[in-house]
Protein backbone atom coordinates (compact mmCIF):
# COMPACT_ATOMS: atom_id res chain seq x y z
CA UNK A 1 0.00 0.00 0.00
CA UNK A 2 1.16 3.52 -0.73
CA UNK A 3 -0.23 6.55 1.08
CA UNK A 4 -0.37 9.22 -1.62
CA UNK A 5 -1.89 12.05 0.43
CA UNK A 6 -2.77 12.53 4.09
CA UNK A 7 -4.73 15.47 5.50
CA UNK A 8 -6.18 14.42 8.84
CA UNK A 9 -7.60 17.89 9.51
CA UNK A 10 -9.96 17.23 6.61
CA UNK A 11 -10.21 13.54 7.55
CA UNK A 12 -8.72 12.59 4.18
CA UNK A 13 -6.31 9.86 3.17
CA UNK A 14 -5.57 8.97 -0.46
CA UNK A 15 -3.87 5.65 -1.11
CA UNK A 16 -2.99 3.07 -3.74
CA UNK A 17 -3.53 -0.68 -3.38
CA UNK A 18 -0.35 -2.54 -4.37
CA UNK A 19 -1.19 -6.16 -3.59
CA UNK A 20 -3.78 -8.58 -2.24
CA UNK A 21 -2.71 -8.10 1.37
CA UNK A 22 -3.51 -4.39 1.04
CA UNK A 23 -7.11 -5.29 0.19
CA UNK A 24 -7.36 -7.20 3.48
CA UNK A 25 -6.02 -4.23 5.44
CA UNK A 26 -8.34 -1.86 3.60
CA UNK A 27 -11.38 -3.99 4.44
CA UNK A 28 -10.61 -3.58 8.13
CA UNK A 29 -10.63 0.24 8.15
CA UNK A 30 -13.48 1.21 5.78
CA UNK A 31 -16.69 1.63 7.75
CA UNK A 32 -20.30 2.59 7.20
CA UNK A 33 -20.59 6.35 6.71
CA UNK A 34 -17.11 6.83 5.23
CA UNK A 35 -16.88 8.77 1.96
CA UNK A 36 -14.93 6.91 -0.74
CA UNK A 37 -13.86 8.57 -3.99
CA UNK A 38 -12.38 6.70 -6.94
CA UNK A 39 -12.52 6.26 -10.69
CA UNK A 40 -15.09 3.68 -11.74
CA UNK A 41 -17.32 2.46 -14.55
CA UNK A 42 -21.02 3.27 -14.35
CA UNK A 43 -23.68 1.98 -16.70
CA UNK A 44 -25.66 4.98 -17.92
CA UNK A 45 -29.16 4.51 -19.31
CA UNK A 46 -29.79 6.13 -22.66
CA UNK A 47 -33.17 7.29 -23.90
CA UNK A 48 -35.23 4.41 -25.27
CA UNK A 49 -32.73 1.72 -24.18
CA UNK A 50 -33.11 -0.83 -21.37
CA UNK A 51 -31.42 0.21 -18.12
CA UNK A 52 -29.24 -2.91 -18.11
CA UNK A 53 -27.94 -2.33 -21.62
CA UNK A 54 -26.65 1.23 -21.35
CA UNK A 55 -23.07 2.24 -22.04
CA UNK A 56 -20.50 1.78 -19.28
CA UNK A 57 -18.83 5.16 -18.89
CA UNK A 58 -15.69 5.93 -16.85
CA UNK A 59 -16.23 8.59 -14.20
CA UNK A 60 -15.10 9.69 -10.75
CA UNK A 61 -17.70 9.18 -8.02
CA UNK A 62 -17.90 9.70 -4.28
CA UNK A 63 -20.13 7.31 -2.34
CA UNK A 64 -21.20 7.21 1.29
CA UNK A 65 -20.45 3.66 2.38
CA UNK A 66 -23.23 1.39 3.59
CA UNK A 67 -21.64 -2.01 2.90
CA UNK A 68 -18.15 -3.49 2.55
CA UNK A 69 -17.77 -7.05 1.32
CA UNK A 70 -14.55 -9.04 1.14
CA UNK A 71 -14.24 -12.59 -0.09
CA UNK A 72 -11.12 -13.99 1.67
CA UNK A 73 -10.46 -16.18 -1.37
CA UNK A 74 -11.04 -13.42 -3.91
CA UNK A 75 -8.78 -10.62 -5.05
CA UNK A 76 -11.46 -7.91 -4.91
CA UNK A 77 -13.07 -5.71 -2.30
CA UNK A 78 -16.58 -4.47 -3.06
CA UNK A 79 -17.59 -1.16 -1.46
CA UNK A 80 -21.24 -0.20 -1.86
CA UNK A 81 -23.07 2.99 -0.99
CA UNK A 82 -25.09 5.99 -2.09
CA UNK A 83 -23.57 8.35 -4.66
CA UNK A 84 -22.95 11.75 -3.05
CA UNK A 85 -20.78 13.37 -5.71
CA UNK A 86 -20.72 12.63 -9.44
CA UNK A 87 -21.08 14.22 -12.88
CA UNK A 88 -24.25 16.32 -12.87
CA UNK A 89 -25.16 15.43 -16.46
CA UNK A 90 -25.88 11.80 -15.55
CA UNK A 91 -28.17 12.59 -12.62
CA UNK A 92 -26.93 9.71 -10.46
CA UNK A 93 -26.63 11.47 -7.09
CA UNK A 94 -28.64 9.55 -4.52
CA UNK A 95 -28.43 6.29 -6.46
CA UNK A 96 -26.51 3.22 -5.29
CA UNK A 97 -23.15 2.26 -6.73
CA UNK A 98 -20.51 -0.37 -5.95
CA UNK A 99 -16.77 0.17 -6.29
CA UNK A 100 -14.62 -2.86 -7.10
CA UNK A 101 -11.18 -2.47 -5.54
CA UNK A 102 -8.29 -4.65 -6.64
CA UNK A 103 -4.51 -4.46 -7.05
CA UNK A 104 -3.53 -1.14 -8.63
CA UNK A 105 -6.67 0.74 -7.51
CA UNK A 106 -6.34 4.26 -6.08
CA UNK A 107 -8.98 5.70 -3.78
CA UNK A 108 -9.58 8.51 -1.33
CA UNK A 109 -11.11 7.85 2.09
CA UNK A 110 -12.72 10.61 4.15
CA UNK A 111 -13.68 9.76 7.73
CA UNK A 112 -15.33 11.85 10.41
CA UNK A 113 -12.64 10.50 12.72
CA UNK A 114 -9.45 8.57 12.03
CA UNK A 115 -8.88 6.40 15.08
CA UNK A 116 -5.33 5.69 16.14
CA UNK A 117 -5.96 2.06 15.22
CA UNK A 118 -6.91 3.01 11.65
CA UNK A 119 -3.63 4.89 11.26
CA UNK A 120 -1.63 2.03 12.79
CA UNK A 121 -3.16 -0.38 10.27
CA UNK A 122 -2.29 1.96 7.37
CA UNK A 123 1.25 2.35 8.68
CA UNK A 124 1.69 -1.41 8.94
CA UNK A 125 0.23 -2.02 5.48
CA UNK A 126 2.55 0.55 3.92
CA UNK A 127 5.54 -0.91 5.75
CA UNK A 128 4.72 -4.44 4.55
CA UNK A 129 4.37 -3.28 0.94
CA UNK A 130 7.91 -1.96 1.08
CA UNK A 131 9.20 -5.43 1.95
CA UNK A 132 7.93 -7.03 -1.26
CA UNK A 133 7.40 -10.71 -1.96
CA UNK A 134 9.47 -13.79 -2.71
CA UNK A 135 9.02 -16.57 -5.26
CA UNK A 136 9.71 -20.16 -4.22
CA UNK A 137 10.30 -23.11 -6.54
CA UNK A 138 10.27 -26.73 -5.34
CA UNK A 139 11.45 -28.95 -8.20
CA UNK A 140 12.84 -32.31 -9.25
CA UNK A 141 13.06 -34.25 -12.52
CA UNK A 142 9.30 -34.88 -12.55
CA UNK A 143 7.88 -31.42 -11.99
CA UNK A 144 8.17 -27.99 -10.41
CA UNK A 145 5.81 -26.14 -8.05
CA UNK A 146 6.05 -22.35 -8.14
CA UNK A 147 4.61 -20.32 -5.26
CA UNK A 148 4.51 -16.72 -4.09
CA UNK A 149 5.12 -15.79 -0.45
CA UNK A 150 3.89 -12.45 0.81
CA UNK A 151 3.86 -10.85 4.22
CA UNK A 152 0.88 -12.95 5.31
CA UNK A 153 0.38 -15.86 2.96
CA UNK A 154 1.92 -18.43 0.63
CA UNK A 155 0.06 -18.98 -2.62
CA UNK A 156 0.69 -21.73 -5.18
CA UNK A 157 0.83 -20.20 -8.65
CA UNK A 158 1.82 -22.94 -11.10
CA UNK A 159 2.87 -26.54 -11.47
CA UNK A 160 5.05 -27.45 -14.44
CA UNK A 161 5.38 -31.12 -15.34
CA UNK A 162 8.49 -32.48 -17.01
CA UNK A 163 8.34 -35.14 -19.66
CA UNK A 164 11.85 -36.49 -19.29
CA UNK A 165 12.48 -39.84 -21.01
CA UNK A 166 14.47 -42.60 -19.33
CA UNK A 167 18.10 -41.97 -18.43
CA UNK A 168 19.08 -44.42 -21.18
CA UNK A 169 17.86 -41.94 -23.82
CA UNK A 170 20.65 -39.43 -23.24
CA UNK A 171 20.03 -37.21 -26.27
CA UNK A 172 16.27 -37.11 -25.82
CA UNK A 173 16.64 -36.44 -22.11
CA UNK A 174 19.00 -33.50 -22.67
CA UNK A 175 16.59 -31.89 -25.13
CA UNK A 176 13.58 -32.37 -22.88
CA UNK A 177 15.51 -31.06 -19.89
CA UNK A 178 16.23 -27.84 -21.78
CA UNK A 179 12.54 -27.52 -22.69
CA UNK A 180 11.52 -28.13 -19.08
CA UNK A 181 14.02 -25.60 -17.74
CA UNK A 182 12.94 -23.09 -20.39
CA UNK A 183 9.27 -23.40 -19.38
CA UNK A 184 10.10 -22.86 -15.71
CA UNK A 185 12.29 -19.87 -16.56
CA UNK A 186 9.64 -18.31 -18.81
CA UNK A 187 7.06 -18.65 -16.02
CA UNK A 188 9.44 -17.05 -13.52
CA UNK A 189 10.20 -14.21 -15.95
CA UNK A 190 6.49 -13.44 -16.31
CA UNK A 191 6.00 -13.46 -12.54
CA UNK A 192 9.18 -11.47 -12.00
CA UNK A 193 7.95 -8.67 -14.25
CA UNK A 194 4.60 -8.54 -12.44
CA UNK A 195 5.49 -8.72 -8.76
CA UNK A 196 9.18 -7.70 -8.62
CA UNK A 197 10.12 -10.26 -5.93
CA UNK A 198 12.94 -9.61 -3.51
CA UNK A 199 14.29 -13.08 -4.22
CA UNK A 200 13.62 -16.40 -5.93
CA UNK A 201 14.41 -19.46 -3.82
CA UNK A 202 14.86 -22.75 -5.70
CA UNK A 203 14.91 -26.02 -3.77
CA UNK A 204 14.36 -29.72 -4.27
CA UNK A 205 15.93 -33.14 -3.74
CA UNK A 206 19.20 -34.08 -5.42
CA UNK A 207 21.23 -32.03 -7.87
CA UNK A 208 18.47 -31.25 -10.38
CA UNK A 209 17.85 -27.82 -8.89
CA UNK A 210 21.56 -27.04 -9.27
CA UNK A 211 21.43 -27.73 -13.00
CA UNK A 212 18.39 -25.49 -13.32
CA UNK A 213 20.08 -22.68 -11.38
CA UNK A 214 23.12 -22.87 -13.65
CA UNK A 215 20.85 -22.82 -16.71
CA UNK A 216 18.75 -19.89 -15.42
CA UNK A 217 21.72 -17.77 -14.38
CA UNK A 218 23.32 -18.26 -17.78
CA UNK A 219 20.12 -17.47 -19.70
CA UNK A 220 18.99 -14.53 -17.55
CA UNK A 221 21.85 -13.08 -15.48
CA UNK A 222 19.73 -10.20 -14.13
CA UNK A 223 17.06 -12.47 -12.70
CA UNK A 224 19.73 -15.00 -11.79
CA UNK A 225 21.13 -12.53 -9.28
CA UNK A 226 17.84 -12.83 -7.38
CA UNK A 227 18.02 -16.63 -7.23
CA UNK A 228 19.08 -18.50 -4.13
CA UNK A 229 19.42 -22.19 -3.46
CA UNK A 230 17.13 -23.91 -0.98
CA UNK A 231 16.39 -27.49 -0.01
CA UNK A 232 13.16 -29.48 -0.11
CA UNK A 233 12.44 -33.21 -0.04
CA UNK A 234 9.84 -33.05 -2.83
CA UNK A 235 8.54 -30.86 -5.65
CA UNK A 236 4.99 -30.32 -4.37
CA UNK A 237 3.47 -27.41 -2.45
CA UNK A 238 4.43 -29.18 0.77
CA UNK A 239 8.02 -28.90 -0.46
CA UNK A 240 7.56 -25.13 -0.68
CA UNK A 241 6.24 -25.02 2.89
CA UNK A 242 9.10 -27.26 3.96
CA UNK A 243 11.60 -24.68 2.68
CA UNK A 244 9.92 -22.05 4.82
CA UNK A 245 9.88 -24.24 7.94
CA UNK A 246 13.52 -25.18 7.51
CA UNK A 247 14.50 -21.53 7.13
CA UNK A 248 15.89 -22.06 3.63
CA UNK A 249 14.33 -18.78 2.54
CA UNK A 250 14.87 -17.10 5.88
CA UNK A 251 16.97 -14.22 4.61
CA UNK A 252 13.99 -12.88 2.70
CA UNK A 253 11.13 -14.42 4.65
CA UNK A 254 12.26 -12.72 7.84
CA UNK A 255 11.53 -9.53 5.92
CA UNK A 256 8.10 -10.83 5.01
CA UNK A 257 7.26 -12.09 8.49
CA UNK A 258 5.94 -15.46 7.34
CA UNK A 259 8.59 -17.52 9.12
CA UNK A 260 7.99 -15.44 12.26
CA UNK A 261 4.27 -16.19 12.05
CA UNK A 262 4.97 -19.92 11.95
CA UNK A 263 7.39 -19.69 14.87
CA UNK A 264 5.00 -17.54 16.93
CA UNK A 265 2.07 -19.93 16.50
CA UNK A 266 4.29 -22.94 17.24
CA UNK A 267 5.45 -21.25 20.45
CA UNK A 268 1.82 -20.74 21.53
CA UNK A 269 1.04 -24.41 20.97
CA UNK A 270 4.22 -25.50 22.73
CA UNK A 271 3.22 -23.48 25.79
CA UNK A 272 -0.30 -24.92 25.64
CA UNK A 273 1.07 -28.46 25.45
CA UNK A 274 2.99 -27.80 28.68
CA UNK A 275 -0.08 -26.32 30.41
CA UNK A 276 1.94 -23.16 30.92
CA UNK A 277 0.49 -20.16 32.78
CA UNK A 278 2.24 -17.87 30.29
CA UNK A 279 -0.27 -18.34 27.48
CA UNK A 280 -3.95 -17.57 26.99
CA UNK A 281 -6.37 -17.74 24.08
CA UNK A 282 -9.84 -16.52 23.12
CA UNK A 283 -10.78 -12.91 22.32
CA UNK A 284 -12.09 -11.95 25.76
CA UNK A 285 -9.31 -13.73 27.64
CA UNK A 286 -6.59 -12.10 25.52
CA UNK A 287 -8.24 -8.67 25.78
CA UNK A 288 -8.21 -8.99 29.58
CA UNK A 289 -4.51 -9.92 29.50
CA UNK A 290 -3.74 -6.96 27.23
CA UNK A 291 -5.63 -4.52 29.47
CA UNK A 292 -3.62 -5.76 32.46
CA UNK A 293 -0.38 -5.20 30.57
CA UNK A 294 0.45 -8.90 30.78
CA UNK A 295 0.52 -9.68 27.05
CA UNK A 296 3.92 -9.82 25.36
CA UNK A 297 2.77 -10.84 21.88
CA UNK A 298 -0.80 -11.13 20.57
CA UNK A 299 -1.69 -13.25 17.55
CA UNK A 300 -4.92 -12.50 15.67
CA UNK A 301 -6.10 -14.63 12.76
CA UNK A 302 -7.28 -12.87 9.60
CA UNK A 303 -10.72 -14.47 9.94
CA UNK A 304 -11.17 -12.71 13.28
CA UNK A 305 -9.40 -9.51 12.27
CA UNK A 306 -11.64 -8.95 9.24
CA UNK A 307 -14.90 -10.10 10.84
CA UNK A 308 -17.19 -7.01 11.00
CA UNK A 309 -18.85 -8.39 14.12
CA UNK A 310 -15.47 -8.49 15.87
CA UNK A 311 -14.30 -5.01 14.76
CA UNK A 312 -14.74 -3.25 18.12
CA UNK A 313 -12.97 -5.98 20.10
CA UNK A 314 -10.17 -6.24 17.53
CA UNK A 315 -9.63 -2.48 17.63
CA UNK A 316 -9.61 -2.62 21.43
CA UNK A 317 -6.95 -5.33 21.23
CA UNK A 318 -4.77 -3.29 18.88
CA UNK A 319 -5.21 -0.10 20.90
CA UNK A 320 -4.34 -2.04 24.06
CA UNK A 321 -1.24 -3.48 22.43
CA UNK A 322 -0.12 0.02 21.44
CA UNK A 323 -0.76 1.31 24.95
CA UNK A 324 1.07 -1.52 26.73
CA UNK A 325 3.76 -1.98 24.05
CA UNK A 326 2.74 -5.52 23.27
CA UNK A 327 3.53 -6.84 19.81
CA UNK A 328 0.61 -7.94 17.66
CA UNK A 329 0.63 -10.01 14.51
CA UNK A 330 -2.10 -10.75 11.96
CA UNK A 331 -1.93 -14.40 10.82
CA UNK A 332 -3.39 -15.42 7.45
CA UNK A 333 -6.26 -17.85 8.08
CA UNK A 334 -5.56 -19.75 4.85
CA UNK A 335 -2.01 -20.55 5.95
CA UNK A 336 -1.00 -23.52 8.08
CA UNK A 337 -0.28 -21.41 11.20
CA UNK A 338 -3.52 -19.48 10.60
CA UNK A 339 -5.56 -22.68 10.49
CA UNK A 340 -3.99 -23.80 13.76
CA UNK A 341 -4.72 -20.45 15.37
CA UNK A 342 -8.33 -20.49 14.15
CA UNK A 343 -8.74 -23.92 15.75
CA UNK A 344 -8.37 -22.28 19.18
CA UNK A 345 -10.59 -19.30 18.46
CA UNK A 346 -8.34 -17.16 16.27
CA UNK A 347 -6.75 -15.10 19.06
CA UNK A 348 -3.94 -16.07 21.43
CA UNK A 349 -1.27 -14.37 23.49
CA UNK A 350 2.06 -15.17 25.05
CA UNK A 351 2.23 -13.52 28.47
CA UNK A 352 4.99 -11.62 30.23
CA UNK A 353 3.84 -12.94 33.60
CA UNK A 354 1.08 -15.05 35.14
CA UNK A 355 -2.32 -13.47 35.69
Swiss-Prot record:
Task: Tell whether Cytoplasm is among the UniProt keywords.
Answer: yes
Keywords, A to Z, come to: Cytoplasm, Endonuclease, Hydrolase, Metal-binding, Nuclease
Q: Which top-level enzyme class is recorded in the Swiss-Prot or TrEMBL entry?
A: hydrolase
What are the coiled-coil residue ranges?
A: none
| Record-linked InterPro entries | eFR1_2_sf, eRF1_1_Pelota, eRF1_2, eRF1_3, Pelota/DOM34_N, Pelota_arc, Ribosomal_eL30-like_sf, Transl-rel_pelota
The UniProt comment on domains reads: The N-terminal domain has the RNA-binding Sm fold. It harbors the endoribonuclease activity.
- Cofactor entry: a divalent metal cation
Q: Which GO terms describe its molecular function?
A: endonuclease activity; metal ion binding
Q: What this chain does, per the record?
A: May function in recognizing stalled ribosomes, interact with stem-loop structures in stalled mRNA molecules, and effect endonucleolytic cleavage of the mRNA. May play a role in the release non-functional ribosomes and degradation of damaged mRNAs. Has endoribonuclease activity.
Gene Ontology CC terms: cytoplasm
Family, as annotated: Belongs to the eukaryotic release factor 1 family. Pelota subfamily.
Q: Report the EC number(s), separated by commas if there are several.
A: 3.1.-.-
- By its UniProt entry, which NCBIfam families does this protein fall under? pelota (TIGR00111)
Query: Where does the record place it?
Result: Cytoplasm
According to its UniProt record, where is this protein mainly located? cytoplasm
Q: What name does the UniProt record give this protein?
A: Protein pelota homolog
Subunit and partners = Monomer.
Q: Which SUPFAM superfamilies match?
A: Dom34/Pelota N-terminal domain-like, L30e-like, Translational machinery components
Any single GO BP term = nonfunctional rRNA decay
Amino acid sequence: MRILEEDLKRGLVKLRVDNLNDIYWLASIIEEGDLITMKTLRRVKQEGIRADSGERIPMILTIEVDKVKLDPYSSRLRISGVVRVGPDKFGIQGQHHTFSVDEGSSLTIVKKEWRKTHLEILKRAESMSEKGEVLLVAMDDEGATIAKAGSMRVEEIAYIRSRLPSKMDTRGREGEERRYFSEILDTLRELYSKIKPRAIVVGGPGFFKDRFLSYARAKDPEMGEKMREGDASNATFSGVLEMIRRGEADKVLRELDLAKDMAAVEEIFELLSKNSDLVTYGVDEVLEAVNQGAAEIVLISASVFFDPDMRDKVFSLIEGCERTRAEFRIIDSTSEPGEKLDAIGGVAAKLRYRI
